[in-house]
Amino acid sequence: MSFSEFTKNDYALIDNEYDSLMKAARPRCRDEEEVQMVVKSFEFANQAHKNVRRRSGEPYIIHPIEVAKIVVTEIGLGYKSICAALLHDVVEDTGYTVEDIRNLFGDKIASLVDGLTKIKTVLDNEDRKGNNNMSSTESMQAENFKRILLTLNDDVRVVLIKLAD
């Protein structure tokens, strides 16, 4: 990730992707309150990732928008999952905490974001371990798989959002 001032083209790209997301998300929302929660999630994530770019040079916020679009269009999840998809990298990559998300977006969305953060931690730890000892690697992979399956026990949406990620 890198930081650099967004250009007019960057803002136009963000607006187009956001409009595309909202077009897909509105039918999944039962009322205007749910729509506004998606809007609030986007605005919060957009501000948290302001002027942050991916290695490709693209504005970082495009990634969470794309994940949210997959969550709604290909998996068919509802507004809480859309919000969690938009917010999933805020806790991982900024100074915000799960508690901040809970205070702003409620327990359920915070729980989804927390689950996504925990899965990322498990997967990142596995990547760092390397393949020095095959049996310990297999044991570590089995343990990580078990942790991911336990996440399913909390809320299957966490794994579905992670698949979209």
Which ranges hold each PLM region?
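Active-site helical microenvironments for divalent-metal-assisted chemistry
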Residues: 1-164
